[in-house]
């Protein structure tokens, strides 16, 4: 018969091991594992009113635009300007160009280049953010204007994407030194959709320039979810 103290120590070790296994079982998947398990959701068909704003403090130039934007699998992405104002140069080169660039991306079937997959990124668990979201550090596998180097923030409970913060891994032009981007998401009618994009670009000669775009949804996947209206104070320009 084993000495009582050895038996007690053996039982204690078994108990500790069982508790550790129980704890591991109860802890379940990590936020990173939950996020990766979700995979990319299919493209969302929608109609939304967007407001775009851009500003360059160095030259004291700014502009804004509201536009109806739509996407469906048959007709792709399209937009109609509802109203706009401010610098004609910024409206043309930044605001209109942003929507035209998005239209081109969809027309060329390029969204897969930007998706959060192992083909595009490496993933590492990060720290919990101040707002309670779990962070995931993402590193692009190649330099691409559609890929960011930074962090994504997900709900710890289910891995659902809430925010992206990072720097474009490749700048869109020689004149642009770097672009920092924050993109926020919400679930509306059970569907994850972007609700805002903010960016700060550092440009040779022009210096620091800011861009912001917000979304108000009218329909998502055929379901009416809101009644957005262009600002009544805006004036439609030719």
Identify the residue ranges that each predicted region occupies.
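Cys-His-centered catalytic/binding microenvironment captured across papain-like cysteine peptidases
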Residues: 188
